[in-house]
Amino acid sequence: NAGAPQHLCGSHLVDALYLVCGPSGFFYNPKGIVEQCCHKPCSIFDLQNYCN
């Protein structure tokens, strides 16, 4: 289930951002997104907040 919140860390997190944001890219704010998506599970909608 792609919409289910999950823990994403390191390269998995970067890969997910590329998939979610596509050609527009994303701004990588390690502190914010690691706190939100690695330490706690996050959803695709959370990832979209980091797209440009």
From Swiss-Prot:
Secreted keyword on record: yes
Signal peptide range in chain numbering: none
CC terms in the record's Gene Ontology section: extracellular space
Cellular localization per UniProt: Secreted
Swiss-Prot/TrEMBL GO biological process terms: glucose metabolic process
Keywords associated with the record: Carbohydrate metabolism, Disulfide bond, Glucose metabolism, Hormone, Secreted
Gene3D superfamilies according to UniProt: Insulin-like
Tagged with keyword Disulfide bond: yes
GO molecular function per UniProt: hormone activity
Disulphide-bridged cysteine pairs: C9-C38, C21-C51, C37-C42
Function: Insulin decreases blood glucose concentration. It increases cell permeability to monosaccharides, amino acids and fatty acids. It accelerates glycolysis, the pentose phosphate cycle, and glycogen synthesis in liver.
Subunit structure comment from the entry: Heterodimer of a B chain and an A chain linked by two disulfide bonds.
Family indicated by similarity: Belongs to the insulin family.
Listed name of the protein: Insulin
Organism: Piaractus mesopotamicus (Small-scaled pacu)
Taxonomic lineage: Eukaryota, Metazoa, Chordata, Craniata, Vertebrata
Protein's gene: ins
